[in-house]
Every structure is written in C-alpha cells, then in structure tokens.
C-alpha cells in the first residue's frame, strides 16, 4: 500500500503542483499555523469538522490551550473578554493570507430570552459544537467522546472555556480535564481554545512536519 503522504504528493503533481484540498485529510489531522503565539511562533490546529457546521468549510480547532482568560463581566459571550481576545487579539496574530481565507460563521447562543445569532471569523466552541447537545450550532464531527475533548496547557490537562451560558444553574460552560463539562463562574480564568473555518478546497502541502502536522498553502 502506498503511504498517504506519497499518494497525496502524487495527486498534487497530477493536479499541477497546487496541493491537495484540506478536506481530503481525516478528522483529527493537525494543521500547523505559523503566527505570533506567545513567542513560540507556531501552533497546531486539529481538523474537527468537514462540510458540516459550514457547507464547503473545514473547522480547525486549536489542539491545545492558547492561554487562560476570564469569560467576561457577565455570562454573555458577545463582546465579552473571551470573545474579544479570540476575535480580535488572536485573530490579528494570524497571517494575513489565512485571515483572508477565514469564513464568516453564524451560530446561535442560548440566552434567557432564547437563541441569539452571532457571526464571527474566530470563536470559542459552543457546548453543541463540543458534543454536549443543545441547539447552538451543530455538533462537530471530531468530538464524540470525553477523551476527544481533553486539552492541555503547558503539558497538563486543563479546563477550557466554551461560549455557552449555563442557563439552568448560572455561569458558563467549561470543558473539564477529563473531557466532561460543567458550569463555572464567568470571572474565573480557564483555557482559551480558538476555532475558525476555512474553505474545504484550501490546499495543503502533503509532506508532513516532524510532529505529523501539515502546512497550508496560502
């Protein structure tokens, strides 16, 4: 059997050297993003969804935690601390060519008044996207078990924030170190895990990096 990277390279050559589309890769594949990241300069994002949350789009979710942050001064995500960090600060640190590729994503957030839609280029996952049910977008295809949701910060499993309010008990949803979810105060500091969507035909270089990740061709 021909190894995947050689089969993909052959496809790229046949296609004229433009790279294979990212949607050819399986869920969980790591995509390396080169950007200003706390001095490290790179971070891996995992393919979490293909042509599901957004038709014609691939959802990339940071493999591990970017930093820690409060949710905000209230339990409402739009324009709060977490939203502004992801949609402004982290977004602005992405390469311009990648920002140009990012698709607008519209999804609903449950409030005490019902579902309210927001549109973002970069965002924190909702509880629905993370696989905990509800009606805030769609469940991403990768997150089908607690184990699939575990994320680390500085090498240790750590809690990370979702964008959803916990209407029944107050506070906001947080994914715990074992991949389950519960509610915590919006003022507490927990992990930041950004996500974004790019077109499914976006090409990538089929030669993997040493950690098994792949680079986009932008």
Model-derived segments and their meaning:
Residues 1-18:
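N-terminal low-complexity, intrinsically disordered "leader/linker" segments enriched in small/polar
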Residues 16-218:
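Collagenous Gly-X-Y triple-helix signature in extracellular proteins
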């Amino acid at each position: 059997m021909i190894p995947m990277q050689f089969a993909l390279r052959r496809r790229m050559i046949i296609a004229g050297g433009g790279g294979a589309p990212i949607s050819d890769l399986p869920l969980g594949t790591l995509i390396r993003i080169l950007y200003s990241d706390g001095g490290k300069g790179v971070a891996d994002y995992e393919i979490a969804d293909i042509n599901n949350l957004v038709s014609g789009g691939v959802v990339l979710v940071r493999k591990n935690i970017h930093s820690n942050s409060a949710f905000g001064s209230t339990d409402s995500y739009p324009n709060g601390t977490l939203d502004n960090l992801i949609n402004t600060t982290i977004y602005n640190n992405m390469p311009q060519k990648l920002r140009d590729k990012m698709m607008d994503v519209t999804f609903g957030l449950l409030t005490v008044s019902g579902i309210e839609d927001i549109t973002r280029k970069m965002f924190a996952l909702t509880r629905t996207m993370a696989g905990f049910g509800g009606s805030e977008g769609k469940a991403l295809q990768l997150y089908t078990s607690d184990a699939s949701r575990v994320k680390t910060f500085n090498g240790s499993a750590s809690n990370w924030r979702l964008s959803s309010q916990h209407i029944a008990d107050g506070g906001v949803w947080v994914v715990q170190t074992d991949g389950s979810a519960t509610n915590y105060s919006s003022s507490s500091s927990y992990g930041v895990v950004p996500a974004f969507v790019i077109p499914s035909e976006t090409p990538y270089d089929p030669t993997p990096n040493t950690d098994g990740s792949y680079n986009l061709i932008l």
